[in-house]
């Protein structure tokens, strides 16, 4: 069975490193070198189907290495077909990797989620006479506009309270975080969902400040802290494999052969885009769908071929791993 390489991340090192049997499937974790950087990998069957429950092993491996090294973390489940595939990644992305390693050197990520306690609304009702009056009137009438006005007043009061809390929270954290990224908020109870970039030496001070905040807002806010983590949200590099069927369908949509250049892809796309643009076919209900398919096909192939040899033959596509800028 062919042996692939499971990729965890990239570190700065001038010689091969071994980290023990801490990888997926208890595999040995080591580095594959290119000049002054190394890919942290473990051997794995090339057609191995990584199980979702092994994501925890992936995370633990990164955290273990992070104890003594700065590592650019890679997403879960990336398998290169062979060692040369990994070496090619390092060659193509060396300067991006080095710049990112410098940016996150000796730093870690801490995720903080802060939610309202369910008593906060009651506090606002008690403190705001105008809302109390509107609430009492709304209970006595079916007047919809009054209820809408009440809802707006409550939202405004909540927003004001949120701004007060956020100002205080950021003031107490001070300059301990070097950077922060806002994560998606999926419910109304969440006040803040953020990732903070913190110097390793200041980790405990950051935790102490969070404890100070938790104590201060004990019956008002709930704090959830996850970390320390590798700085996923503060690296601009993303590595992905491209699915052959996706690439092949895109090739066929544009009517291309298996060996193409980026200039050929551009030329064919421009011709097809002009020919099938929806503005030129106002009476065709499928024109927009056709144009979208052409545009999507171009984006797939442009991503694949921009910096690499453009062979769309099956084995070449399956061997290729893309190095891309993350989309914030």
What is each stretch, according to the model?
Residues 236-280, 284, 293-328:
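N-terminal J-domain/J-like co-chaperone modules of DnaJ/Hsp40 proteins
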Residues 114, 129, 223, 285-286, ...:
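Flexible domain-boundary/linker segments
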Residues 186, 283-286:
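Short, surface-exposed helix-loop/turn micro-motifs enriched in polar/charged residues
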Residues 1-222, 228-229, 235-242, 247, ...:
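An interfacial alpha-helical scaffold signature
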């Amino acid at each position: 069975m062919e042996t692939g390489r499971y990729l965890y991340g990239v570190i700065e090192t001038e010689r091969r490193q071994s980290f023990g049997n801490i990888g997926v499937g208890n595999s040995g974790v080591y580095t594959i070198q290119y000049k002054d950087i190394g890919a942290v990998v473990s051997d794995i069957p090339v057609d191995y189907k990584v199980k979702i429950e092994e994501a925890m092993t992936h995370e633990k491996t990164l955290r273990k290495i992070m104890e003594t090294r700065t590592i650019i973390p890679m997403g879960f489940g990336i398998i290169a077909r062979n060692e040369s595939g990994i070496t090619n990644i390092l060659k193509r992305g060396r300067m991006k990797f080095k710049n990112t390693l410098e940016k996150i050197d000796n730093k870690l990520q801490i995720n903080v989620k802060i939610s309202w306690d369910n008593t906060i609304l009651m506090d606002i009702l008690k403190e705001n006479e105008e809302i109390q009056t509107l609430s009492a009137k709304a209970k006595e009438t079916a007047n919809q506009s009054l209820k809408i006005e009440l809802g707006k007043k409550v939202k405004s009061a909540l927003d004001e309270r949120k701004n007060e809390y956020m100002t205080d929270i950021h003031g107490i954290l001070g300059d301990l975080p070097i950077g922060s990224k806002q994560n998606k908020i999926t419910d109304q109870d969440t006040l803040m969902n953020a990732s903070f970039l913190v110097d390793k030496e200041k980790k405990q001070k950051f935790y102490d400040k969070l404890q100070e905040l938790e104590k201060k807002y004990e019956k008002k806010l709930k704090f959830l802290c996850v970390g320390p983590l590798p700085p996923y949200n503060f690296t601009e590099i993303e590595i992905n494999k491209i699915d052959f069927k996706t690439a092949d369908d895109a090739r066929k949509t544009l009517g291309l052969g298996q060996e193409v250049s980026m200039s050929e892809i551009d030329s064919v796309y421009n011709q097809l885009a002009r020919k099938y643009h929806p503005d030129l076919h106002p009476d065709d209900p499928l024109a927009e769908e056709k144009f979208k398919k052409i545009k999507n096909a171009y984006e797939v192939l442009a991503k694949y071929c921009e910096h690499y040899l453009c062979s769309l033959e099956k084995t070449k596509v399956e061997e290729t791993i893309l190095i891309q800028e993350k989309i914030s």
